[in-house]
Every structure is written in structure tokens, then in C-alpha cells.
UniProtKB/Swiss-Prot annotation:
Glycans are attached at N56, N82, N129, N166, N221, N283, N313, N351, N495, N519, N547, N571, N588, N614. Sequentially removes both fatty acyl groups from diacylglycerophospholipids and therefore has both phospholipase A and lysophospholipase activities. Substrate preference is phosphatidylserine > phosphatidylinositol. Does not cleave phosphatidylcholine, phosphatidylethanolamine, phosphatidic acid and phosphatidylinositol-bisphosphate. Mainly responsible for the degradation of phosphatidylinositol in vivo. Residues 660-686 form a propeptide. This is Lysophospholipase 3. Its main location: membrane. InterPro entries: Acyl_Trfase/lysoPLipase, LysoPLipase_cat_dom. It is an enzyme of class 3 (hydrolase). It comes from the Eukaryota. It is found in: Cell membrane. Residues 39-592 form the PLA2c domain. Residues 1-26 form the signal peptide. GO terms for biological process: glycerophospholipid catabolic process; phosphatidylinositol metabolic process; phosphatidylserine catabolic process.
Length: 686
């Protein structure tokens, strides 16, 4: 239902000017990638205990509730228009003047590189009133009714792009796709942005290298994540100077569209890694970045810091130099690029026998140093949580004792759909739309692993105090086809009373093929305009059950899911149509644990042991994101070379690093960029 419109030069020009003026008020104090010193109150404390949401978030929610109340009433009225009687439930939710009766909606978009960014964009477009056709033929208005929007890795590229471009719409991105400096111009890889113009590519990488080197020369630790984030940003903020070189994540709080609560509350998710280790599991500390704070609800930290002043040298939240703070460290590209999963997955490919031997030798030597020096992760130094006292006494103080904080992609703990910030009891979310674009299986489709791991986390030490509804094992997900269509989990709160608290109902929206083979490789770093539009269109169809052709009543069922928690809490009679919906979409506890055949088995992307190259040679497999659907010849030919997905079968690396330093030398900044470029070119990722 998404239709491309003719490019409009005047609109594009006005948009570019507005972005420039907006960014001018949100720039780093140094007007560059380098953080700078700013004044702050002498008595300021930048860290708080995670006992509740922040005062800033609470004040923002009061505004947002007024906005979502109007939008949600309109959406539910349309969704239940064909119901026999929905007046009682709607009257109770909206006419009592009690905001606590208002269902609180959240959307979480998984990681998965550009595959997830584009497919997730289609899902959000289907929920957005601003999308052509979404109000009449989609779930238009649902996004306007949403309070929280979280993303991990590729999902965060989507969330960050929309939020930091003044809450632009996917429709607007589509309308301007043929213009110069258009958002998400993926025609050429971020590695070779000039295409055949090698001078443009060289200039881009020179700018990136200079930016990272300038940060390093200012005595800040840098890593490949800095280079990666800078490279990515040019596709997210093309109208801004050098891809928003000074644009900060905290600038979202200064945008009028956010201040007026006219957009959801954006959240980026990352995983912490204990100094001296390389293992990520369910006990990893999960961090979130929102417009006001970054930190973790987990008992291993239990703290939040003011995201605007990251980079400030503190002890227990107090700046070591009173009255002076650091700003600009929270560079938008850096936070959106706080990811190493894509690096780790692509780096495994260097064992491929088709690479020149000198490249293989060089890469192995380089990657060994990377792993030991932590250059494969994002380094937040100085540590904003240095010497904090809020963590649970049962946990090691490794995080708060360290001078640096080390973060990796939020999906490296196998919880690729970033729901953890949304299931916190303090946020009181009623329903989560979980958009899963993971490549869990051989053909790069999801198998529910992320939800399974989140469910399991509540029973390990780190998950104490959290709740998540019951979900089946991954074999059941696949055998019952739950990974190919929308499924509701946790439909009946009466069956969840043995959990810590009643968790949100989860509407699972897995990536599936409707009009396009959207199971593209995470290593596919370029998409033609036609492919981008097709990926987004397919995402629209995922959210709408193929434009409601698979189920004309699906919008009504979404409405039933939204009101379910409040309906049960308030003891309101459900419309009979909702009972039919729940029978059709709620998982009823049925299991089918029959093992999957080898051709379908899972390919879980665990942390890679880059020091064991010899033992892992031969383990890599070339896997194909194949499709039975016929595509146009141009689409097929342009994507076939990028459809290989590597197998991540290496064991978890538990050996401690011998060197905890994380500072790239002056010469290695440019060398790192060159290595990244060379490896990606030879591995076919470009």
C-alpha cells in the first residue's frame, strides 16, 4: 500500500534547511566529533539509582498520555467498528478521565542490519497515519498511539534515523528517495560510498579517519565502533555536515516534536561486557539509551546516568572537577553504531579459502590484537558509573571499578528483540509489538529464539524481579508456524499470576515473505532503490497480514490485544469478536518439540572466538537467503551476490584478555579504516 511519489525539490530543500537549523541547536560544543567541556552546576550528580523512571521521563509521559489518548481512541474506534458492541470497553477506557485506564503501547524492533532497518520501517509505516494508505488499509494511528519505541542494532538504526531527523516518516523518506542526499541511500555500500568514484570514497574515509583520530588526540579511547558509527551516520543524516559529525543523541530532548510528546519515547539497547572477559549470556548487563539517560535496570548496575554528560570524569556521579562537565560524547552515530555483532559475523568470513593469502594473514594478526585490546567493542571512557554504590551486593563490582565501560550490540546475549526496557514494571506497559527480523535459521528467518531467551532470563540471577509471558521452544515456534505469522503471547493475565508481576501482552511480528524475499543477509551493505522499496513494502504486509487479505479482521484483533490487559484489570466485558481473535492468534500452550531437519536448524550468532582461526577453518558454511518467489531479473541479479550468510559455530570465548587497553594508536585509526574497507571488499560485503 506504500506508493512512491514524484520527488519534490522544494519540499526536499525546506527539509534540508529545517534539519540544518535543528542541528545547529543540537551540536557538540566543539562542533565536531570531539567532546568538549561545558559548565554545569557545582552540586550536580549525574547518576541516580534505578528505582523508578526518571523525573524527566515521568513529566514527558504526562504529555504523551494526552496525545496517545486521542490517537488511540480513534484507532480503537476504527478497529472495532464491525464489532457487535465495543461501547462499554471504550467508554471505560476513555471517558472516565483516568489516564491509568489508558493502555500503554510499546514497539520493539530487532537487530539484523539493513534487513531489520528496512523491514522494520515497513512495519512502522503500516502503523503510521502519515503513510499513504495506512489509515484506510493498514494500522495507521497505532504509531501515534505508541508510548515507547525501542531498537537494537539495525532496529536502532531505524529508530535513531526517524527520531534524530525530527521524527520524520518512512513515507517522507520514500518520497525523497530519488533526491540527492536522501536518507537511506544504500545504492552504494557504506564502505565504498562513491561507487566507481574512488576519489569520493577516499575522501569519505579520510573524513571518518580524521574525525576519530581527533577524538583520540583529545585523549579519549577509541575503537572500531567509532569508525563504524561514523560510516553509518552518513546514510542516516545525509543533509547534515559530514553525516551529523557533531549531532548528539541527547539532542532529541531539545526537539520540539519530542518536547511536545508528538513522537514515541526512543530507546536504544546495548549489552555490557565485564572487563577482562569476552563472553555474553543471559546474565549480561543490558543497557538502554534514552533521550535523558543511559544505564541499566539490572541488579549488576541498577543505575542511570545523564546521557548528555557522558564523557565526564566522575566518582559516584559527581564530576571530579566541580562545575565542569563534558558534552558531545553521546554522538548520535556512535550510539547508533555501538555494535560489534556485525563486525564479528563478517570477520569470521576471513577463513574463506577464496581470499588472497596476504589478506588472510594480515586480518588474522589484526583481529588477534583487536580481541585482546577490546577494539571490537564500543568504549565509554571515562566510565559514567565509576564508584557508584547502587548495584546489588551479590554482584561483582567489576563494572563500577573499571575506568571504562565496554558495550556491545544489544543482541549479543541472543535477546535480539529489545523488549527488556519495555517489560520493566516501572514503565507499566500493557502491550509490546515485537518486530523480529533476526536471522536465526539457515535461510535467515527468525525462529523465536529472542523471545525464548528473554523468557528464560527471568529465571536467572540477572533477571530477578522481571516478568515475561510464557513462550514455547524454538522447535515449536517453527513446527507450528508461529515464526511465519503474528502470534499473541500472554493473552490471559489469570495464567500469569505465578510470575513476579503481570507482564505486557506480546504481539509477535516475525519477518516473513509476502511480496519480497526479505531474508537478506546482514552483510548485504547495499540495496538498490527498488530493493529498498520492496523490503519496506514487505514489512508493511507483515504488519497488516498482507494488506488484510490473509485476515480482513486482523485490525480488530490488534485492537482486542491492545485493550486486553486493561479489560481484565477493570473487569470489563469483552466484545465476543475478541474471543474469536484470541482463539485464532493467542498461543494456547500447544507444543511440538520435534527436532528440525538439518536444512532448517538454527544458526545462533554467539560471540566469536577470533583467536581460534585454525580450529574454526572449515566450520564456516555458505548459506543462502533463497526464495521461491519470483523477483524481477534486476532485483534478483543485484541481490544474489549478497545473499550468503556465514555460520557462527565457534564456541564462546571465556578466556580473559591479556591486555585491557582499548586505545587505538594514532596510525592505527587510519589503518583500522583501511583494514575494514579491504576486508569488506574481499569478503563480498560491498
Amino acid at each position: 500500500m506504500i506508493r512512491p511519489l514524484c520527488s519534490k525539490i522544494i519540499i526536499s530543500y525546506i527539509f534540508a534547511i529545517s534539519q540544518f537549523l535543528l542541528a545547529a541547536n543540537a551540536w557538540s560544543p566543539t562542533d565536531s566529533y570531539v567532546p568538549g567541556t561545558v559548565s554545569c552546576p557545582d552540586d550536580i550528580n549525574l547518576v541516580r539509582e534505578a528505582t523508578s523512571i526518571s523525573q524527566n521521563e515521568s513529566a514527558w509521559l504526562e504529555k504523551r498520555n494526552k496525545v496517545t489518548s486521542v490517537a488511540l481512541k480513534d484507532f480503537l474506534t476504527r478497529a472495532t467498528a464491525n464489532f457487535s458492541d465495543s461501547s462499554e470497553v471504550l467508554s471505560k477506557l476513555f471517558n472516565d478521565g483516568n489516564s491509568e485506564n489508558l493502555p500503554k503501547i510499546a514497539v520493539a524492533v530487532s537487530g539484523g542490519g539493513y534487513r531489520s532497518m528496512l523491514t522494520g520501517a515497513g512495519v512502522l509505516a503500516a502503523m503510521d497515519n502519515r503513510t499513504e494508505g495506512a489509515y484506510e488499509h493498514g494500522l495507521g494511528g497505532l504509531l501515534q498511539s505508541t508510548t515507547y519505541l525501542s531498537g537494537a542494532s539495525g532496529g536502532n538504526w531505524l529508530v535513531g534515523t526517524l527520531a534524530l531527523n525530527n521524527w520524520t516518516s518512512v513515507q517522507d523518506i520514500l518520497n525523497n528517495m530519488q533526491n540527492d542526499d536522501s536518507i537511506w541511500d544504500l545504492s552504494d555500500s557504506i564502505v565504498t560510498p562513491g561507487g566507481i568514484n574512488i576519489f569520493k570514497t577516499a575522501k569519505r574515509w579520510d573524513h571518518i579517519s580524521n574525525a576519530v583520530e581527533s577524538k583520540q588526540n583529545a585523549d579519549y579511547n577509541t575503537s572500531l565502533a567509532d569508525i563504524w558509527g561514523r560510516a553509518l551516520a552518513y546514510n542516516f543524516f545525509p543533509s547534515l555536515n559530514r553525516g551529523g559529525i557533531g549531532l548528539t543523541w541527547s539532542s532529541i530532548r531539545d526537539f520540539p516534536v519530542f518536547q511536545n510528546a508528538e513522537m514515541p519515547f526512543p530507546i536504544s539497547v546495548a549489552d555490557g561486557r565485564y572487563p577482562g572477559t569476552k563472553v555474553i549470556n543471559l546474565n549480561a548487563t543490558v543497557f538502554e539509551f534514552n533521550p535523558f539517560e543511559m544505564g541499566s535496570w539490572d541488579p549488576s548496575l541498577n543505575s542511570f546516568a545523564n546521557v548528555k554528560y557522558l564523557g565526564t570524569n566522575v566518582s559516584n556521579g559527581v564530576p571530579l572537577e566541580r562545575g565542569k562537565c563534558t558534552a558531545g560524547f553521546d554522538n548520535a552515530g556512535f550510539i547508533m553504531g555501538t555494535s560489534s555483532t556485525l563486525f564479528n559475523q563478517f570477520l569470521l568470513r576471513i577463513n574463506s579459502t577464496h581470499l588472497p593469502s596476504f589478506i588472510t594473514r594480515l586480518a588474522r594478526h589484526f583481529l588477534k590484537d583487536l580481541s585482546q585490546d577490546f577494539n571490537d567493542i564500543a568504549v565509554y571512557s571515562p566510565n559514567p558509573f565509576k564508584d557508584t554504590k547502587f548495584l546489588d551486593s551479590d554482584y561483582t563490582t567489576s563494572i563500577v571499578d573499571s575506568d571504562s565501560l565496554f558495550l556491545v550490540d544489544g543482541g549479543e546475549d541472543d535477546e535480539n528483540v529489545p523488549v527488556l526496557p519495555l517489560i520493566q514494571k516501572e514503565r507499566d506497559v500493557d502491550i509490546i509489538f515485537a518486530v523480529d527480523n533476526s536471522a536465526d535459521m539457515r535461510l535467515a528467518w527468525p525462529d523465536g529464539s529472542s523471545l525464548v531467551h528473554t523468557y528464560e532470563r527471568q529465571f536467572v540471577k540477572q533477571g530477578q524481579g522481571m516478568s515475561f509471558p510464557y513462550v514455547p521452544d524454538t522447535n515449536t515456534f517453527v513446527n507450528l508456524g508461529l515464526n511465519k505469522k503474528p502470534t499473541f503471547f500472554g493473552c490471559d493475565a489469570n495464567n500469569l499470576t505465578d510470575l513476579q508481576y503481570i507482564p505486557p501482552l506480546v504481539v509477535y511480528l516475525p519477518n516473513a515473505e509476502y511480496s519480497f524475499n526479505s531474508n537478506q543477509s546482514a552483510f548485504k551493505l547495499s540495496y538498490s532503490e527498488s530493493q529498498r522499496r520492496s523490503m519496506i513494502q514487505n514489512g508493511f504486509e507483515i504488519a497488516t497480514r498482507n494488506n488484510f487479505t490473509d485476515d480482513p479482521e486482523f485490525m480488530g484483533c490488534v485492537g482486542c490485544a491492545i485493550i486486553r490487559r486493561k479489560q481484565q484489570a477493570l473487569n470489563i466485558t469483552l466484545p465476543p469478536e475478541c474471543e474469536t481473535c484470541f482463539k485464532n492468534y493467542c498461543w494456547n500452550g500447544t507444543l511440538d518439540t520435534t527436532p528440525l531437519p538439518d536444512v532448517e536448524k538454527d544458526v545462533h550468532h554467539s560471540f566469536i572466538n577470533v583467536n581460534s582461526f585454525n580450529s574454526s577453518i572449515g566450520q564456516e558454511e555458505s548459506l543462502y537467503a533463497g526464495s521461491s518467489a519470483s523477483q524481477s531479473s534486476s532485483s534478483s541479479s543485484s541481490s544474489s551476490s549478497s545473499s550468503e550468510i556465514p555460520s557462527a559455530t565457534a564456541t564462546l570465548e571465556k578466556k580473559a584478555a591479556t591486555n585491557s587497553g582499548s586505545h587505538l594508536s594514532g596510525i592505527s585509526v587510519k589503518f583500522s579504516a583501511m583494514i575494514m574497507l579491504t576486508l569488506l571488499m574481499f569478503t563480498g560485503a560491498v
